[in-house]
Swiss-Prot record:
Its EC number is 2.1.1.228. Specifically methylates guanosine-37 in various tRNAs. Gene3D superfamilies: 3.40.1280.10, tRNA(m1g37)methyltransferase, domain 2. It is found in: Cytoplasm. The keyword tRNA processing applies. Its main location: cytoplasm. It comes from Staphylococcus haemolyticus (strain JCSC1435). This is tRNA (guanine-N(1)-)-methyltransferase. The gene is trmD. HAMAP family: TrmD (MF_00605). Keywords: Cytoplasm, Methyltransferase, S-adenosyl-L-methionine, Transferase, tRNA processing.
Amino acid sequence: MKIDYLTLFPEMFDGVLNHSILKRAQDKEIISVNTVNFRDYAINKHNQVDDYPFGGGQGMVLKPEPVFNAMKDLQRTDQTRVILMCPQGRPFSQEIAQELSEAEHIVFICGHYEGYDERIRTHLVTDEISIGDYVLTGGELPAMTMTDAIVRLIPGVLGNQQSHQDDSFSDGLLEFPQYTRPREFENMTVPDVLLSGNHANIEQWRHEQKLIRTYHKRPDLLDRYPLTEDDEKFIESYKKQLKNN
């Protein structure tokens, strides 16, 4: 996978891209990354990339020329996903991360001003994505967040593919509780089932714990999760148990 970032602050990506999983993915040549400072593509002597909005209003608007010119130098195809980081976009999710992990080329357009000239949105962008209902200074941090979520799903990036399959949201539920040594710590003990060696019982316990966690912390996810008849019975039994306690 090739990933390009159009940004006014390419140095912001250095720390994220040069450590941990993203660094290893590059070392394995599974991904290649490239930052492009689109200020280099400004068309006047002052390297101006923003201007006042037509019709008046607060703030500045990102000009179309630098972004269009920078995009011309990228080797795009019809399959290239050009992502605009903006609060108007569809909310980022594990499902979108999985979808984008299958792309061969992704371009992130990271703005840093009040808004974008609409022609950028309508003529260059394939996807508008938001990472939440809040405002950030620019699109760099959302692009980094998305990159991490996407790349770890590409086969071969993680040492153990089962790692991401057990993560929260990978199957629509939150992750089950995990424990390691020591077995007992300050009078807190590991559940016996995890030490039983019975893999079927362990898997059942983990699934039930995922249902419990999701019920308490993200009940909205259960509305979209394909609950089995056994799942529904377990949840009802758990609700009754809570009332009795």
